[in-house]
């Protein structure tokens, strides 16, 4: 995969990357892996298709995300069929009615079960917790 594709915002195939190029000289990967713990989302308004088609994504930690300014989250999690764990923080709220949480039942750390029909879910907003797919 070429870096230009990522820089131009067209990285919907990153989840299917099979053979990265140019890593033969790499020695320190400590800051290279995709982590969102330091993302500042306080001024973000559009999260449409943010993780769209990330089929290999198994765990998503959004505990530091502030979605209070977000007005669009359409298809944000569409086709994330491999996602088994979703970590949400007290400032995370789902927006709209087409954010596409994978079809399943989800259990939080208290044992409460929430449903997703593949489009929306009844996972509560602004409730910090870890949700696991059943």
Task: State each model region's role.
Residues 1-27, 31-45, 55-70, 81-94:
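Structural signature of tandem-repeat unit edges
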Residues 70-134:
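Leucine-rich solenoid repeat scaffolds
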């Amino acid at each position: 995969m070429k870096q230009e594709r990522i820089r131009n915002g067209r990285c919907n195939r990153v989840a299917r990357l099979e053979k990265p190029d140019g890593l033969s000289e790499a020695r320190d990967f400590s800051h290279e892996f995709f982590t969102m713990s330091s993302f500042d989302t306080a001024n973000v308004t559009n999260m449409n298709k943010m993780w769209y088609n990330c089929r290999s994504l198994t765990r998503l930690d959004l505990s530091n995300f502030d979605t209070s300014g977000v007005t669009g989250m359409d298809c944000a999690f569409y086709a994330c069929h491999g996602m088994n764990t979703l970590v949400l923080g007290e400032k995370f709220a789902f927006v709209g009615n087409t954010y596409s949480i994978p079809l399943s039942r989800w259990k939080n750390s208290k044992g409460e079960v929430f449903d997703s029909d593949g489009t929306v879910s009844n996972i509560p907003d602004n409730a910090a917790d870890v949700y696991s797919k059943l």
